[in-house]
Each structure stands twice: as structure tokens, then as C-alpha cells.
Amino acid sequence: RQRQMCIRDSGSSLLERFLDNASEIGRTVICVGSGNEGAARGHFAGNITRDGRVELAVGNYERNLNIQLWKNYSDVFRIRLQAPGGEEAELSTNIQGGKYTLELEQTRILVYLGEPLPYAVAQEIYLDMIPAEGSYINAGIWTIRLEPVVTVTGQYYLYLPAGSGIGESTGFYRATPQVTLTIPSTAAKVITVGAYDQVYDTYADFSGRGYADSTRTIGVAAAGLTKPDLV
């Protein structure tokens, strides 16, 4: 089963490394689809200089929603989360135990702070939003504000669950389709295949993709890859 690419997925996960090793045996060629997250509005990438502001639309009748924020461990951000009604709270990134709970309006937010892992240069801050009252979380525009305190790379990435896990009305207003590959298409030695729209004679908008950019040091770009390899 494919899943959306997280920032640390730069070809170093167990599955990706297995496919890379397998491709070196004999005349083995492994092809992998790039996924269908290209137009899902579930991914956002930015490079913070002063203040970063990300708006997330949450549709009606969402029973829960999780948000992954990935950044370099060396970067320190001040992060604030604002609910649709205007109530806001600052997210602490230095809590003993690495997890805590807060409430904004009728939504309870469980915050989990990632720890260092082998091969990982990125930290995950995981937000799990569930109803505090009623059956659904607050619908409307949620705003995430990031203010740099210590900046090394300044890069940050936000991910929502895969398209089938959320409603069609839920997504980032300024989504970034260039970070939408799914594992294992991020493996370095496989041939990643994207989708082609023969009606419009162009790359299919739903097809996942990733980029190589020397100014970015997290994810597929860290490995110096541009995916897909073939359409």
C-alpha cells in the first residue's frame, strides 16, 4: 500500500533501501508509480524568512484530522495555531515526554514532538485534531503561523492524510504539488513512472512528483533526485 511521502523519506526507509538493493541484482529493473497525490491539496512546502502563514480549509463533518509539520532539527520556530473562530494558541516544541494536549474552540489537539532517528535530519511535529465537543472538529479556515527563532535552513513542510482519508473540501489553500511523491517511488534506483493525460497532451495533474533543488536539504531534494523518471 502506498502512502504519502514524509520529509524524511529521501530514499533511506527500509522499503526503499530494499528496492535499491534488489535493483542491483542481475538485470533487474524495478518500476514504481509516483502516486495520485499531485492534485489532492494535502501538501505544502515553504522556506521561512520572517513570518510564515499557512491557511488550511477544513470542510464540514470532519471527525478527525492530522497534520504533519516537518522541519530541520537545527531550526527553531515559534508556532501558533489559530482556529476558525479566532481563538489561538502557541505550540510548545520543548515539552518533557514529547506530547501534550490543548483545546481550541470545540477541537482537542494532541501534539506529538518527534525525536531524532537514524538517517533523519528532520523533526516531525504531529497534530491530531479530534472533537472536544460534539462529533466533528471545527470547520472553516485554520491558520498556522511560523516565526523563526533560530534559522539554519528555514525549510518546512506540511502534510495532510492521503486524499481518501479526508473530505474534498479539506486542504491547503496554496498547496505545493512538487512534494507529492509516495513511497516507494522515492527510492533512488527504481524507475518512477508518472501519469500522462492524453486528452490534454500533458502531465496528469493528479500524478505525484518531486523536485531536485540544491537549496533544499530535506526529502527527495536531499538525494539530488527529480521524479518521476518517466511519464
Residue ranges and their predicted role:
Residues R1-Q4, R8-V231:
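Loop-rich non-cytosolic ectodomains and luminal regions
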